[in-house]
Amino acid sequence: MTILNHTLGFPRVGLRRELKKAQESYWAGNSTREELLAVGRELRARHWDQQKQAGIDLLPVGDFAWYDHVLTTSLLLGNVPPRHQNKDGSVDIDTLFRIGRGRAPTGEPAAAAEMTKWFNTNYHYMVPEFVKGQQFKLTWTQLLEEVDEALALGHKVKPVLLGPITYLWLGKVKGEQFDRLSLLNDILPVYQQVLAELAKRGIEWVQIDEPALVLELPQAWLDAYKPAYDALQGQVKLLLTTYFEGVTPNLDTITALPVQGLHVDLVHGKDDVAELHKRLPSDWLLSAGLINGRNVWRADLTEKYAQIKDIVGKRDLWVASSCSLLHSPIDLSVETRLDAEVKSWFAFALQKCHELALLRDALNSGDTAALAEWSAPIQARRHSTRVHNPAVEKRLAAITAQDSQRANVYEVRAEAQRARFKLPAWPTTTIGSFPQTTEIRTLRLDFKKGNLDANNYRTGIAEHIKQAIVEQERLGLDVLVHGEAERNDMVEYFGEHLDGFVFTQNGWVQSYGSRCVKPPIVIGDVSRPAPITVEWAKYAQSLTDKPVKGMLTGPVTILCWSFPREDVSRETIAKQIALALRDEVADLEAAGIGIIQIDEPALREGLPLRRSDWDAYLQWGVEAFRINAAVAKDDTQIHTHMCYCEFNDIMDSIAALDADVITIETSRSDMELLESFEEFDYPNEIGPGVYDIHSPNVPSVEWIEALLKKAAKRIPAERLWVNPDCGLKTRGWPETRAALANMVQAAQNLRRG
């Protein structure tokens, strides 16, 4: 029984973000479709070859996507919303881009499909839309073409296909409501056809992804698996693939299926290998997801070996990444600025392939010397002074309940804040950032590259802050912001100023479409060596008599949008960040900043996959926010900002944050979101976003007024604020001025009654 290895998928964007550049060039009309397709072919060939050279036996094919793999599946099944269809009914790459972006070089623009987080990762997928009576047929043959490509290059191929039940689970019904699971029998014939085509090509194994099997699914959905897989059996061997959590709770459903193998995530799941071996049919292959596909840490391969060695020789076994390597940067070897010690702790996608090769060889031979050598740096890290800061650990251990309580309840604080700020009814403000112009970006880049000295850089930033204050005063806003000209990214900026974080040069991962992010890495205990935002906030406040908000990114968001440590809990990291930012709140307050906003857009998206785990997460997530904020005096007003489409299920926790003011994204839902706050009887102040900053359209005064009147039917007017629904970083100044002028006018009209 020779053990093989495989990956569940590989990053698509290219080491130098070649895919992103090719997509954006094509969208802008600067290159042809043929040139774009050629870049895709070149990247696929390179990535297959790199994995093979790193020692991977079975190469994933079908993991590449022009925008998103769920969207690719929609096209494969012929699920194209009517508004995005070509007039002749054909499907091409522009159809795909119209669904993803709302527009493409050909065809009519139409509203893009909704985008949401892929399970609990920072990757986003395009939500499939389903209508009653929908028809499906094999339409977009990208998967088959790529299998042919890989076979022609002489590779051992394992096609990757998103499974039918997870696909339906991820979608949403449009128009007349019905149970989307009822479409299962309509999509299964397309899956049968695809599997038949793969069988014709001599494919032995197909990786069929059903990550929905790690969720607490309704019984009807669990019951659908058996008949669905009965219909799919017989043409090729199916590796039923799960990830992001364990499968033990749904193992009875899984073991009844007519598949030939099961992949389990042994990093994020708590499944016991011996128990899995005992319960799985003896003729099934077990694919052990031992290498973390969604982090950047080198694995302790001696531990991984120990985890699996007892079942070697007892059943067919493969070793694999826990999930697709899509969530990891590509190659550590191109990082030249990380010091040698820290660099020795990391493994990116290609290094993870090497880890899988080392693990396979050791399991086949019984010789573990190479594993011990590879694991030495990560074992040495446990005792590194770069990781452990006794002062931080001592401070964290000393936290009491008092540290997460404001001195007085909201009603008492609100009184003190009204007396201090004397704001009018319907107070107007913005969420924090103003347009990041080419001048601002060039200024920051020149400084970063060493082409500009610190004095000239600071003079330039001060000028942009001054301009933002002048613009806001001219517009008549009530509470101002400094505009964040000095910040590249709301998480990266804080990470750069906190001890315990490091940054990469090329550690890009795909967020959605052509958007890539370069998350900070938490390598050790987090602390704040010096004030971060105080100087610029103080400067901005010196330019005006109106209050200027201090702007912080909250601890849960910094955690969720970074690569976390693996040796301590997420709760520990969040609370360490909270303590560091608590000192920032105290320093802002001492500098005369009376309104401080702590953004937590990631609070909801950090929720665990299983609802039964939510309470524990929300408890420490809320506590981290409160530790951050509770140092503020009664007359200091704490704001928070959140952008989600769903509040109902976490309203208790949002109220428990005890922020004096919460601003939320509501414009696209036509204020429907406020229903949650009304039903819950939310006690504090609230700023429902009155226009969508993601669109360049300028809202009319009448439209904003109508939205605010609608809001006032749900929330008492004396507790309402007036603001856009998000930061204005990505907008241009002309539409920003016009939209804010209309927003201020609408508020003034309402004050006059």
UniProtKB/Swiss-Prot annotation:
Keywords tagged on the record: Amino-acid biosynthesis, Metal-binding, Methionine biosynthesis, Methyltransferase, Repeat, Transferase, Zinc
Binding-site residues for Zn(2+), renumbered to this chain: H641, C643, E665, C726
Residues annotated as binding L-methionine: I431, G432, S433, E484, D599
EC top class, as a word: transferase
Keyword Repeat attached: yes
Pathway it works in: Amino-acid biosynthesis; L-methionine biosynthesis via de novo pathway; L-methionine from L-homocysteine (MetE route): step 1/1
Xref: InterPro entries: Cbl-indep_Met_Synth_N (IPR013215), Cobalamin-indep_Met_synthase (IPR006276), Met_Synth_C/arc (IPR002629), UROD/MetE-like_sf (IPR038071)
Keyword RNA-binding tagged: no
One annotated GO molecular function: 5-methyltetrahydropteroyltriglutamate-homocysteine S-methyltransferase activity
HAMAP family recorded: Meth_synth
Protein name listed in UniProt: 5-methyltetrahydropteroyltriglutamate--homocysteine methyltransferase
Gene: metE
